[in-house]
């Protein structure tokens, strides 16, 4: 009979389990040393799993905000650069249109007009800027190119939809009228000269606004109406140099004044600004009537023509998909009396194809930078500041001033004066600088949010590392301890496996 070593059976039964457990612990420590991760799953973190989940969720949210901020910042920088370039183009045009820039040419166009055409095209390119397939000036419809082509805007599409050139011609016909006197009628008899607004009253052409005389010899009587009328009586022979002044309101909101000066009998001078003193008051009145007609004709061909272009261009660029441009009813246009009515997408080019809602342009695209903070980064190509510039560039590009036309220089100067005034963005008109400021403010908001979130991310990342990560040094020490323990266990097990009572004794 063989007597087993005391307790060796119990030890052998327990030792394998302990060795397996220790070996498993060693394997896990080796994994921790390789990955620097405390656990492979949230469940293995024990009570720290809630902390880990919370920190990871917060970091994910911060990453989402930071990614949006990065994209938004790129969009804002490109949009801001586009608006700044546009502002420079408008300033250059103001300088180009200063006085004494008219030079007759075989093409009927001056150098500033050619430059304005190029600026118009460049502005369209700026407004069609896109980043990663997103158009920056299309409002909420970021997948739609906001403007049509230069050719389509100016000339129409060739299939019956009118462009700006046609709309300007229609408006000019309506303003000048069949007689070319700005829809005013002239007349009188004996010692009287008369001017009157057309009947029935309408919104085209000149509107009489008043009259004054430097002498009692010329007595004006003005009736405001509408329709307004003016009667001038030659009460006695005027002296050389006496003047009659007639004030006219134009459809673009400007005012002009006709000044007619009496000149000595037998002398010559332009009928559009002077009249000859006749043999008697009746003859003088007849000369005055002829001078009034000539002056109105010249004013209609120059300042009124320039005003017509402004009105038509403003109406054209105010048009959008939901609100097509206003057009003069017709043909015929030169006798039109009905107010301008909206065209349709079938007969009029709609230059702007983007979103044209009533909400603020900046709100059409937003970046969420915090739980309750949205930063507006949107823009629309049909914002007032852009419409004004496009209209002025287009007017200069469309107009022609033949060298053979005696009124070309006066009409050119009337055009450039209006272009320069409009491009000053005076009064309550939106200015490019306002858009630049708003986009700059949005950039500042994004930068501050980014700085704040990066600071928070660094703190949370450090906190998460304390929960999920391990120290290589500590793990290495634990591994050495376990290796020593395993080695001792293996040696002890080996010795005990050979132990018998005989060996023990």
Question: Predicted regions: what is each one?
Answer:
Residues 4-6, 11-12, 107-110, 216-217, ...:
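N-terminal start-of-chain detector that recognizes signal peptides
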Residues 26, 30-33, 37, 140-212, ...:
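Polar, low-complexity export/assembly segments characteristic of proteins
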Residues 231, 360-362, 478:
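Short alpha-helix capping/helix-loop boundary micro-motifs
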Residues 210-235:
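Charged, amphipathic alpha-helical segments
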Residues 1-152, 402-505:
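Amphipathic alpha-helical polymerization modules
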């Amino acid at each position: 009979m063989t007597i087993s070593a005391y307790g060796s059976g119990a030890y052998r039964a327990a030792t394998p389990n302990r060795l397996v457990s220790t070996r498993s612990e060693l394997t896990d420590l080796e994994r921790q040393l390789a990955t620097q991760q405390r656990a492979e799953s949230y469940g293995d973190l024990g009570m720290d799993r809630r902390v880990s989940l919370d920190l990871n969720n917060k970091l994910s949210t911060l990453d989402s905000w930071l990614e949006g901020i990065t994209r938004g910042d790129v969009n804002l920088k490109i949009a801001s650069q586009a608006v700044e370039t546009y502002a420079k183009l408008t300033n250059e045009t103001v300088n180009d249109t200063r006085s004494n820039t008219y030079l007759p040419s075989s093409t009927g166009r001056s150098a500033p007009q050619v430059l304005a055409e190029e600026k118009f095209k460049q502005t369209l390119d700026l407004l069609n800027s896109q980043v990663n397939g997103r158009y920056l000036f299309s409002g909420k419809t970021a997948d739609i190119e906001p403007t049509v082509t230069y050719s389509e805007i100016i000339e129409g599409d060739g299939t019956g939809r009118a462009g700006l050139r046609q709309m300007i011609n229609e408006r000019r016909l309506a303003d000048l009228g069949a007689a070319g006197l700005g829809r005013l009628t002239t007349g009188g008899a004996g010692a009287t000269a008369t001017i009157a607004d057309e009947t029935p009253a309408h919104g085209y052409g000149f509107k009489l606004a008043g009259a004054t005389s430097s002498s009692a010899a010329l007595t004006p009587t003005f009736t405001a109406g509408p329709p307004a009328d003016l009667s001038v009586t030659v009460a006695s022979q005027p002296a050389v140099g006496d003047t009659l002044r007639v004030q006219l309101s134009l459809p673009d909101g400007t005012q002009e004044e006709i000044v007619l000066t009496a000149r000595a009998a037998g002398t010559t001078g332009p009928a559009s600004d002077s009249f000859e003193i006749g043999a008697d008051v009746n003859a003088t009145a007849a000369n005055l009537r002829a001078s009034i007609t000539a002056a109105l004709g010249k004013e209609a061909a120059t300042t009124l023509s320039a005003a017509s272009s402004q009105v038509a261009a403003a109406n054209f660029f105010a048009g959008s998909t939901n609100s097509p441009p206003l057009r003069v009813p017709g043909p015929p246009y030169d006798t039109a009396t009905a107010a301008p009515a909206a065209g349709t997408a079938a007969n009029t080019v709609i230059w702007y194809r983007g979103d044209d809602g009533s909400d603020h342009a900046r709100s059409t695209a937003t970046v969420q930078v915090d739980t309750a903070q949205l930063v507006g980064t949107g823009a629309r190509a049909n914002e007032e500041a852009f419409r004004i510039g496009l209209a002025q560039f287009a007017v200069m590009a469309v107009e022609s001033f033949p060298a053979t036309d005696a009124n070309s220089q006066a009409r050119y100067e009337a055009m450039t004066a209006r272009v320069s005034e409009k491009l000053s963005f005076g009064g309550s008109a939106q200015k490019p600088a306002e858009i630049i400021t708003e986009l700059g403010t949005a950039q500042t908001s994004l930068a501050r949010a980014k700085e704040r979130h990066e600071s928070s991310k660094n703190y949370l990342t450090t906190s998460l590392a304390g929960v999920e990560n391990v120290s290589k040094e500590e793990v290495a020490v634990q591994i050495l301890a376990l290796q020593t323990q395993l080695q001792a266990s293996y040696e002890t097990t080996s010795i005990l496996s050979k132990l018998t009572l005989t060996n023990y004794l």
